[in-house]
Amino acid sequence: MTVISQVILQADDELRYPSSGELKSISDFLQTGVQRTRIVATLAENEKKIVQEATKQLWQKRPDFIAPGGNAYGERQRALCIRDFGWYLRLITYGVLAGDIEPIEKIGIIGVREMYNSLGVPVPGMVEAINSLKKASLDLLSSEDAAAAAPYFDYIIQAMS
């Protein structure tokens, strides 16, 4: 839920107008809007490049994943892994756009460890995959934009760890 929605709901629950502190938090949120949309646009426009680079980094670091017996061995398994990279990147853009982890949490992070465990996917491998996705993504952003986007990647990494 965005800062604006939170402030409105809380003020309404308490039958009052938003406080000056709440209005400041809305103002701060709006001031970062251009940056957040710029980050999302860059990530969305470069999804294919980011996913390719993240995949390359992961396979170089962990060739055992694509070797016989590895979780990404074979065309089908590899395609599923690549699909997940795109899915997580999209999920991160939702969080960046909202300026909040709630979309990440609600749409895709709750129960992720259990899901991967039930599918036999090693969660530490997924953490490595998200780290590769983070590096490939942040490398395309300015240092200021990378600093703003990094916590959303870190949230997913932490939730999986």
Curated annotation (Swiss-Prot):
Keywords assigned: Antenna complex, Bile pigment, Chromophore, Electron transport, Membrane, Methylation, Photosynthesis, Phycobilisome, Thylakoid, Transport
GO BP: any one term: photosynthesis
Modification after translation (UniProt): Contains one covalently linked phycocyanobilin chromophore. The chromophore is added by phycocyanobilin lyase CpcS 1.
Family assignment from sequence similarity: Belongs to the phycobiliprotein family.
Disulfide bonds: none
Pfam families, alphabetized: Phycobilisome (PF00502)
Modified residue annotations for N4-methylasparagine: 71
UniProt-annotated binding residues for (2R,3E)-phycocyanobilin: 81
Assembly with partners or alone: Heterohexamer of two alpha chains, one alpha-B chain and three beta chains.
GO cellular component: phycobilisome; plasma membrane-derived thylakoid membrane
UniProt name for this protein: Allophycocyanin subunit alpha-B
Predominant localisation class: membrane
SUPFAM superfamilies assigned: Globin-like
Topology in membrane: Peripheral membrane protein
Compartment list: Cellular thylakoid membrane
Gene name for this UniProt entry: apcD
Function of the protein: Light-harvesting photosynthetic bile pigment-protein from the phycobiliprotein complex. Allophycocyanin has a maximum absorption at approximately 654 nanometers.
Organism from which the protein derives: Nostoc sp. (strain PCC 7120 / SAG 25.82 / UTEX 2576)
Source domain of life: Bacteria
